[in-house]
């Protein structure tokens, strides 16, 4: 993929460390946690209504192989890391970028499945999902943006490994 970062750290803005602190602090706010969980719950309900098939193959985590990139907000990255209680090291983020997969891919499965971002929750290999997943994703992304705005959280939307690099730097 031409847009995939060769080195996620090269794309970091000058204020990356400050942004990471702001996002991490916000991820620990009970009201932010509750709103993120509500977004994920609503997304799960809407997804279930469509009945997509997930074969738990881990294909969604192998970005280059399947021709897609994962984009997330900084807050989502911070919340995922908080919930998972693990931040990939700089070496792990770089290695994932070199493999063109997710640093949380473990033994062919998602290592943060319960805490995964909206983009992961919207993506299904099931071809029947193509008709509805984009619209659902856009609705949930609008809610994420509104969450940022309502709490004064800096909004950035970027490629997953680059957003993780904010925290591993």
Region annotations inferred by a language model:
Residues 1-169:
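Short loop/turn segments that flank or connect secondary-structure elements
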């Amino acid at each position: 993929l031409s847009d995939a970062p060769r080195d996620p750290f090269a794309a970091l803005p000058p204020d990356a460390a400050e942004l990471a602190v702001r996002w991490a602090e916000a991820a620990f706010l009970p009201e932010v946690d509750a709103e993120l969980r509500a977004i994920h719950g609503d997304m799960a309900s809407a997804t279930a209504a469509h009945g997509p098939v997930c074969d738990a193959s881990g294909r969604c985590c192998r970005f280059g192989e399947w021709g897609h990139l994962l984009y997330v907000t900084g807050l989502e990255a911070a919340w995922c890391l908080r919930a998972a209680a693990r931040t990939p090291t700089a070496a792990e983020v770089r290695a994932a970028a070199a493999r063109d997969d997710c640093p949380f891919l473990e033994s062919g499965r998602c290592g943060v499945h319960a805490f995964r971002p909206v983009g992961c929750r919207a993506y299904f290999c099931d071809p029947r999902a193509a008709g509805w997943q984009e619209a659902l994703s856009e609705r949930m992304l609008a809610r994420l943006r509104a969450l940022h705005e309502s709490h004064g959280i800096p909004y950035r939307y970027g490629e997953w490994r680059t957003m993780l690099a904010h925290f591993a730097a």
